[in-house]
């Protein structure tokens, strides 16, 4: 018997989903405007999030509520590790660290894993369904914006162990719909999914502020240089 969890998650998080997509950093990325440094930082933050989530999912993989939606072929942390090696080099693990917003996200995942692992379903849904839905589009955008050769540094968007991503997405939704959950549990999962979207939004907003600071610094330096050049020109006139 279906519990309609997939539909309830989609409908119950529609507002949060829309808010996350409308963060300026995300809109900029979707329009093909992103610099390599910001992209690298985004990937490193996602690495820490996926690593935490996938470790906790694996820990609970025999749990009756987690087992039906535990698919190792969805795991992204190893793919992200390949990308980070491309962008940062072999010593990437010594270079990257989670941002403040990312630490909050990780701590939330670890907290619910310990106290109520049922809620891990919400985080898996939020990340993996998004990856399966828009991965190839985002890959093309990133490839054009970053001008990377032969799709290098874009392993995050590739599901090598999944032949048909759309079919797998339907399989995942069906697995959600057959979980042995009560109405109360569904409400808790939907509420946690909204928290997950908010945590993602905070990470993107943090990157947005970092991007603004960098842009402002570049603009100020440009204005200073222009002023100096103008002064030199006036002295020679």
Curated annotation (Swiss-Prot):
GO terms for biological process: heme catabolic process; heme oxidation; photosynthesis; response to oxidative stress. InterPro entries: Haem_Oase (IPR002051), Haem_Oase-like (IPR016053), Haem_Oase-like_multi-hlx (IPR016084), Haem_oxygenase_CS (IPR018207). It is an enzyme of class 1 (oxidoreductase). GO terms for cellular component: chloroplast. GO terms for molecular function: heme binding; heme oxygenase (decyclizing) activity; metal ion binding. Its EC number is 1.14.14.18. Heme b binds at residue 17. It is found in: Plastid, Chloroplast. The keyword Coiled coil does not apply. It catalyses: heme b + 3 reduced [NADPH--hemoprotein reductase] + 3 O2 = biliverdin IXalpha + CO + Fe(2+) + 3 oxidized [NADPH--hemoprotein reductase] + 3 H2O + H(+). SUPFAM superfamilies: Heme oxygenase-like. The keyword Cytoplasm does not apply. Keywords: Chloroplast, Heme, Iron, Metal-binding, Oxidoreductase, Photosynthesis, Plastid. Catalyzes the opening of the heme ring with the release of iron. Key enzyme in the synthesis of the chromophoric part of the photosynthetic antennae. Belongs to the heme oxygenase family. This is Heme oxygenase. It comes from Guillardia theta (Cryptophyte).
């Amino acid at each position: 018997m279906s519990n309609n969890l997939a539909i309830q998650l989609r409908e119950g998080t529609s507002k949060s989903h829309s808010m996350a997509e409308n963060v300026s950093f995300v809109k900029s990325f979707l329009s093909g405007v992103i610099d390599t440094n910001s992209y690298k930082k985004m990937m490193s933050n996602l690495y820490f999030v996926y690593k935490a989530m996938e470790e906790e999912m694996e820990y609970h993989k025999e749990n009756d509520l987690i087992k039906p939606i535990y698919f190792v072929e969805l795991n992204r942390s190893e793919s992200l590790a390949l990308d980070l090696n491309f962008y940062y080099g072999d010593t990437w693990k010594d270079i990257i660290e989670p941002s403040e917003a990312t630490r909050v996200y990780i701590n939330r995942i670890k907290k619910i894993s310990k106290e109520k692992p049922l809620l891990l379903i919400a985080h898996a849904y939020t990340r993996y369904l998004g990856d399966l839905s828009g991965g190839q589009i985002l890959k093309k955008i990133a490839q054009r914006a970053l001008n990377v050769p032969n799709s290098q540094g874009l392993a995050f968007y590739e599901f090598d162990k999944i032949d048909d991503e759309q079919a797998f997405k339907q399989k995942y939704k069906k697995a959600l719909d057959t979980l042995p959950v009560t109405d109360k549990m569904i409400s808790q999962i939907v509420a946690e999914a909204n928290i997950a979207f908010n945590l993602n939004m905070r990470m993107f907003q943090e990157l947005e502020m970092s991007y603004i600071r960098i842009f402002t610094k570049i603009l100020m330096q440009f204005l200073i240089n222009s002023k100096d050049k103008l002064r030199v020109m006036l002295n020679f006139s």
